[in-house]
Amino acid sequence: MSWYAYCIAERNAFPELCRHRRPMPLEGVTGLFGNQTFLFPASDLAVIVSEHTPEDAARMDQSAAKDHANVIADCFKLSTVLPFRFGTTFADDDSLRRSVRSNQRHFTANVERLRGKAEMHLKVLVDDTCPGTSERDLTVGQLYLTSLRESAARQRERQSRARALSLQMHRMFLPIAEEITCKRTDSGKMLLDIAHLIDNKTVERYQNKYTSALQEMKECRMQLSGPWPPYHFVQRQAPQHNA
């Protein structure tokens, strides 16, 4: 039987696994396509899985991706979790056990590092004030070179502003760790996508700081979501599996 994998969790978070060595149903959590989820014990860990068929493989769409995330979020309420990428499958019981066994030290270290932690997600949208290319009385070649120089200058200015904003956010929220990406939107604005790793106990304090940030940084449009499982902070090591 093939298994679809959602995440790795701590075995001791699920009392029903204390007396069993075989997969046990995880009550109250529905998997992809309405399938029953199971707790698959593997040493000190548990892998949350559901049965997977060839027909299921043809139905892996955006709705399925959302269901995948919902299962991980439900498990996160019960345990530290290490999310698997959407679409991760294992051919059979032995394949799943081998993967966990070969990555045991890596998985355990991640669980220890992320225990009691959560991810908060900030989107910060600001005007991109870098000037556009001005067309003067220049030849085609001169315009091209001028465009290249101005593009490079805009990119440097954009990166400098992104770093300044990122530092401001870091000082304001004081996360344990952070992952930041910056891009220019189609509307010409600059979007900072910020993931902050924080202690579970400080979620309310973080939310209060966000409320203050909205008042202090009126030139920015901000959006907060979370707490989430720490997707951005799981140190990846390719597990051996059949996908």
How would you label these PLM feature ranges?
Residues 1-243:
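An interfacial alpha-helical scaffold signature
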